[in-house]
């Protein structure tokens, strides 16, 4: 669009076909919400697993029957699971509150809309300043010859 709101009819690039490719990017708020949801689900799954293993450990400890080695094996797995859940929780919370800068190191994606509007402005200014060159045939048609 030029300053006088006249539509510019620009020829396509070399090859005769104009292709407009727009990179679709998920908004930052959407990414943040999905990340928070995934982290919450991971913590809830870990807490649920801890609850189930604790219940199994309590039921095997209360039996005090013929098993002598089994409760010890369950307790080892329970300690490993506790360690895994605590590590997962610390890792998730550390990433949320800026403990690591792996998100800051990611390059900011270009704003396609701003770049396109800037390009349109440049094209419009070029047309307004220099005028549009029409082929000789169109100039002659406009004059009526």
UniProtKB/Swiss-Prot annotation:
The keyword DNA-binding does not apply. Belongs to the adenoviridae leader protein family. It is found in: Host cytoplasm, Host perinuclear region. It comes from the Viruses. Very stable protein with a low turnover rate. This is I-leader protein. Induction: Expressed in the intermediate phase of the viral replicative cycle. Keywords: Host cytoplasm. The lineage of its organism: Viruses, Varidnaviria, Bamfordvirae, Preplasmiviricota, Tectiliviricetes. Pfam families: Adeno_52K.
């Amino acid at each position: 669009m030029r300053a006088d709101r006249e539509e510019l009819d620009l020829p396509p690039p070399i090859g005769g076909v104009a292709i407009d490719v727009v990179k679709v990017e998920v908004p930052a708020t959407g990414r943040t919400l999905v990340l928070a949801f995934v982290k919450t689900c991971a913590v809830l799954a870990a807490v649920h697993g801890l609850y189930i293993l604790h219940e199994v450990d309590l039921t095997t400890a209360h039996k005090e029957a013929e098993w002598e080695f089994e409760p010890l094996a369950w307790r080892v797995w329970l300690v490993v699971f506790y360690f895994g859940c605590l590590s997962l929780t610390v890792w998730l919370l550390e990433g949320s509150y800026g403990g690591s800068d792996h998100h800051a190191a990611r390059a900011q994606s270009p704003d396609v809309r701003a770049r396109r509007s800037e390009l349109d402005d440049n094209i419009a200014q070029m047309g307004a300043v220099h005028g549009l060159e029409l082929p000789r045939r169109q100039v002659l048609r406009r004059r009526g010859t």
